[in-house]
Amino acid sequence: MNARVYRVLPAVFTLVLLACASATANDPLLLDSRELVKEFGSALQSELKHGLTEGGPVAAISVCKDKAPQIASQLSRRSGAKVRRTSLRHRNPANAPEPWEAEVLRQFGLPSSTTDSTAPPEYFSKADDGSARYMAVIRTGPVCLACHGDSLAPEIAAKIDADYPHDRARGY
């Protein structure tokens, strides 16, 4: 009889976990968070494409430096959420992760670069007061490696060195 109980219990735990995951997947705060990340990514990608077209990778550095914080600020004001970028290997010390963010980033396995087709890792946690925390990975694509890769063109390295003297966001 004990053997039968042991076979049933894992199935019950799996069903309970799946039910919880389903409830979380439909949480309005999670859905809103995903939408904000999507909006941020689309706006930043559009600005980067424009910068690359107008002035190449050196101009794109200014997009990440100036436009990305503006986009995050606009989304923050509109939504009431705190929208920002962070990394364990940040370029700007102002973007250093808070302790909880650093822990989530370590759980994600960052700062590894992943460009496979699986869904990027995300984190969602809801507090008792109704607030929530959400993080999602920004994938490092081939165009990103011009400024974040192992080998940078001299003019790109010089611009990054001038704009970010404490840069830690290379070598992906």
Model-derived regions: residue spans:
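Extracytoplasmic c-type cytochrome modules immediately beyond a signal peptide or single-pass transmembrane anchor
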Residues: 24-143, 155-172
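Bacterial N-terminal signal peptides that target proteins for export
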Residues: 1-12
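Exposed boundary/loop context
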Residues: 12-13, 49
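Intrinsic disorder/low-complexity signature
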Residues: 3, 23-24
